[in-house]
Curated annotation (Swiss-Prot):
Main location: membrane
Renumbered ranges of motif Type-2 MIT-interacting motif: 168-179
Top-level taxon of the source organism: Eukaryota
Entry GO terms, CC: ESCRT III complex; late endosome membrane; multivesicular body
Species for this entry: Gallus gallus (Chicken)
Role of this protein: Probable core component of the endosomal sorting required for transport complex III (ESCRT-III) which is involved in multivesicular bodies (MVBs) formation and sorting of endosomal cargo proteins into MVBs. MVBs contain intraluminal vesicles (ILVs) that are generated by invagination and scission from the limiting membrane of the endosome and mostly are delivered to lysosomes enabling degradation of membrane proteins, such as stimulated growth factor receptors, lysosomal enzymes and lipids.
Protein name, as recorded: Charged multivesicular body protein 6
Similarity comment text for this entry: Belongs to the SNF7 family.
InterPro entries membership: Snf7_fam (IPR005024)
Coiled-coil positions: 10-94
Region (Disordered): 169-200
GO biological process: late endosome to vacuole transport via multivesicular body sorting pathway; protein transport; vesicle budding from membrane
Length: 200
């Protein structure tokens, strides 16, 4: 139990992870700032309209200038958010590339070790030995096949014909099912034996 809950595993948070988190937090703050400015712009527009109705043109003009400045700030904020998002994407993609490169490095090391164990010369030697063994076996097969005389060939054919003939002469298997129990034997009645008559 102590091992299970006592010690926490170390979190493997990298510097890149921290940077991505900070960039995303900054982006979220900028979005909140944008929302606040957008709400303020709507209010100031309504207020400028009200001031114009009241005949306070200069105050309305001043308010619209402020509104215009805040709209420019919104545009700048959009650009900053785009830059932050691009930076986050670049960091995340670079992390993926680093993992791919690390995988390629490990794979390359593995291949090099395998090549050291099995060099081209070793492969060529094994293939050569295999071809030699196949050729040797082929020669043995040819010798064995060529060692049969004409009499042997005739004897083989004769045996083959005999086996074929045996199969042809076998009786057919009855198609009717066999009775389950054999019929009981009926006893033969005792006949009286004829008496022998002596010849006179």
């Amino acid at each position: 139990m102590g091992n299970l809950f006592g010690r926490k595993r170390r979190s493997r948070v990298t510097e890149q992870d921290k940077a991505v988190l900070q960039l995303k937090q900054q982006r979220d703050k900028l979005r909140q700032y944008q929302k606040r400015i957008s709400l303020g712009l709507e209010r100031e527009r309504e207020l400028a309209r009200q001031l114009l109705k009241e005949g306070k043109k200069e105050k309305a003009m001043l308010l619209l200038k402020k509104k215009r400045y805040q709209e420019q700030l919104l545009d700048k904020t959009d650009n900053q958010i785009s830059n932050l998002e691009r930076m986050v994407q670049d960091i995340e993609f670079t992390q993926i590339e680093m993992k791919v490169i690390e995988g390629l490095k490990i794979g390359n090391e593995c291949l090099n070790k395998m090549h050291q164990v099995m060099s081209i010369e070793e492969v060529e030697r094994i293939i050569g030995e295999t071809q030699d063994a196949v050729e040797y076996q082929r020669q043995i097969d040819e010798i064995l096949a060529g060692s049969l005389t004409e009499e042997d060939e005739d004897a083989i054919l004769e045996e083959l014909n005999a086996i074929t003939q045996e199969q042809l002469e076998l009786p057919d298997v009855p198609s009717e099912p066999l009775p389950e129990e054999p019929p009981e034997a009926t006893p033969v009645k005792n006949r009286p034996k004829p008496e022998l008559v002596a010849a006179s």
